[in-house]
Amino acid sequence: MKTLLLLRHAKSSWDEPSLRDFDRPLAPRGKRDAPRIGKALSERGPLPDLAISSPAARTRATIKAVMASARLEAELQVEESVYGASSAELMKLIRRLPGEKACVMIVGHNPGLEDLVARLTGETERMPTAALACVEFQIDRWKDIEDGEGKLVWLLTPKQLGHESEKE
């Protein structure tokens, strides 16, 4: 069995209009939500063996906060292709994952992540900022992953964790 954790970056800031999209930092709400999602992941599991992040500032800040609060010791890779990736591009990445990794987290962006959840599970789910989806596959090798064969085990959002994330 293989498990894929799909994490959308936490809420980013638009306060500095001169910044490129790639360089936008987390907003105060994002800085609160990312550790809360990490804590929930550590309580719920499964924990990833490998985390792959888009190189954008907001995704790197999100995964660092999630890993710290979850006390994850997973290998972290920054992958250029995740930034702005479509579901098809993410599928190519997933099919190349190392076979020994049973649980992998990808930290990225919409619409790619929402589209990927729908593609893998057949379920249309909204992925707001800092949402984390857990999808399981009855396969032994990542290269065997196919559309519609994943089971959405859970989808966690900051809103489900309470109203603290809505204060800004």
PLM features: residue spans?
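Active-site-proximal alpha-helix that buttresses catalytic centers in soluble enzyme cores
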Residues: K2-T3, L7-S81, A85, E89, ...
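Active-site catalytic microenvironments for nucleophilic, acid-base chemistry
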Residues: A40, A65, S69, R96, ...
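Glycine-rich phosphate-binding loop signature in dinucleotide/nucleotide-binding domains
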Residues: R44-P46, L97-A102
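Domain-level recognition of soluble alpha/beta enzyme cores
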Residues: E123-V153, P158
